[in-house]
Amino acid sequence: MGIGKGSAKRTTIILDEEEREFIDKLIREGKEPGIKPLISKMLDIYRSMMIYDWRFPGEYYCGISRIVFLNVELVNILVHNIPKEKWREVGRKMGEASKVYIEATLGIRATDLEKWLEVFKRLRVQGFGDFYVKDKYIMIKAPFIGEPEIWAGFLEGLLGVELDIKTFTAPFVFEIKQAKHNVG
């Protein structure tokens, strides 16, 4: 029986009692539909977050960048101690730094419109929010930073565009005014 390009292979793993109880609890509570989907999800996260490069515990790398698990409350403290008139500029610098990381890690140009879905998938995997493009608009659902000025600057620095903010509460909508250099 073929699945994809290869055929399925049965694998047996032996779990400690505590591990099996944890998995059974997840399934019982409806958090996971079964063992196979759970393992598939774990492998997807392992690959996409490059966990094989982590120096566990406490030192995590995803490509060329060190990443941390940080409470949104701590990010909000940082944000709200930056003068509001600097938010767009700070966001732009964050976007430029993310552009370097994404281009080096994924091997794609973040300013290439055809690669934006890959860029947005990476941001979603890392917890930035859910990003959508429709015509000349970019929308962010569930952003981890609640200030559209920062996001406008971030996307401008990352994608090489100029944006107008259309909504000031999440989900954020930005209109693409001008693409600076979005060619492959």
Tell me the role of every PLM-derived stretch.
Residues 73-77, 82-139:
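An N-terminal amphipathic alpha-helical segment
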Residues 167-184:
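C-terminal edge-of-domain segments
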Residues 117-172:
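Short, hydrophobic/π-rich interface segment
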Residues 22, 33-59:
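Short, basic amphipathic alpha-helical segments that act as recognition/interaction helices
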Residues 15-17, 144, 178-182:
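Non-catalytic surface loops within mature trypsin-like serine protease
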Residues 1-20, 27:
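Short Lys/Arg-rich basic patches
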Residues 48-90:
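N-terminal leader/targeting helix
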